[in-house]
């Protein structure tokens, strides 16, 4: 998708660059979420799996003396069509959680340029590849009809568009 966007001269804003809070630096295994937090609907063990992947990226994070939030933002910005990044600021539960104001200040001090080499960008992508970990929302071949507001059948014209840009058909 990134290559298709670049080929079409489309700029991208990536959101949730903190990956559900994993890169905010405050989550621990067995993280306790506030009542009503939408992340509780994710598959069991996602926090632990995410944190294990962050640990595998630690040498690159430390090499550049980055916070986890800066690391995730800069990795996203390392991709040519990505021009802006937006984390999700959520006040986590617990006395040891970072105040949301501190997270906003940290985000505001983001370095302007990514320090990563292409080899590091590729290494981070390989470590973080979570293809197939959750059902994607939106248009998909999985849906024959719209049973939920965030899932709907893939229309033929969307498949034609995906094919034209080399995006495949396995959605």
What residue ranges belong to the model's regions?
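Structured C-terminal cap/extension of enzyme domains
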Residues: 3-171
